[in-house]
C-alpha cells in the first residue's frame, strides 16, 4: 500500500513539473509578443528590408542542424549522433513532454494495478 502511495505522489509531482514548464514557455512567448508590438512601424519596415534578402527557413526533420532553434516544430530538437567517429547533429521529433508524461502515467497505472493484486 505504501508503494502505491509513493507512485501516486511521484505521478502528481511529475505532472506539476510538466505543467509549470509549459506555463513558463507560454509566458516567454507572451513576453516576446509584447516586445514585438512595442516596436515602431519604421523599425518593422527597416527589419523587413534587411531580412527580405535573407532566407528565413527552418530545418526539417532528419536534416543537419546546429541548435534547437533551427529545427521546425515545437517538439523537434537538434540531437547529436556519432557516425563513423564523427558527430552529426540532426533535427529529430522527440514527441515533446506530453508524450513522456503520458508514458509515465501509463507505467504508473500498470504498477498500481499490480499493487492491488
UniProtKB/Swiss-Prot annotation:
Tissues where this protein is expressed: Expressed by the venom gland.
Location within or outside the cell: Secreted
Biased composition (Basic and acidic residues): 23-55
Region (Disordered): 20-55
Keyword Disulfide bond set for record: yes
Keyword Transcription regulation recorded: no
Signal peptide residues on this chain, from the entry's feature table: 1-20
Entry's Gene Ontology cellular component terms: extracellular region
Propeptide feature ranges: 21-56
Major subcellular location class: secreted
Keyword terms of this UniProt record: Disulfide bond, Ion channel impairing toxin, Knottin, Secreted, Signal, Toxin
Domain of life: Eukaryota
MF terms in GO: ion channel regulator activity; toxin activity
Cysteine-cysteine disulfides: 58-72, 65-78, 69-115, 71-91
Biological role: Putative ion channel inhibitor.
Family: Belongs to the neurotoxin 03 (Tx2) family. 02 subfamily. HNTX-XV sub-subfamily.
UniProt note: domains: The presence of a 'disulfide through disulfide knot' structurally defines this protein as a knottin.
Protein's recorded name: Hainantoxin-XV
Originating organism: Cyriopagopus hainanus (Chinese bird spider)
Top-level taxonomy: Eukaryota, Metazoa, Ecdysozoa, Arthropoda, Chelicerata
Amino acid at each position: 500500500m505504501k508503494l502505491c502511495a509513493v507512485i501516486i505522489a511521484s505521478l502528481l509531482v511529475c505532472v506539476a513539473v510538466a505543467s509549470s514548464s509549459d506555463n513558463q514557455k507560454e509566458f516567454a512567448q507572451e513576453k516576446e509578443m509584447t516586445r514585438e508590438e512595442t516596436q515602431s512601424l519604421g523599425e518593422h519596415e527597416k527589419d523587413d528590408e534587411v531580412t527580405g534578402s535573407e532566407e528565413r527557413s527552418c530545418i526539417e526533420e532528419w536534416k543537419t542542424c546546429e541548435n534547437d532553434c533551427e529545427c521546425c516544430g515545437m517538439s523537434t530538437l537538434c540531437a547529436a549522433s556519432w557516425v563513423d567517429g564523427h558527430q552529426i547533429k540532426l533535427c529529430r521529433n522527440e514527441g515533446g513532454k506530453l508524450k513522456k508524461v503520458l508514458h509515465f502515467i501509463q507505467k504508473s497505472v500498470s504498477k498500481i494495478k499490480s499493487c492491488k493484486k
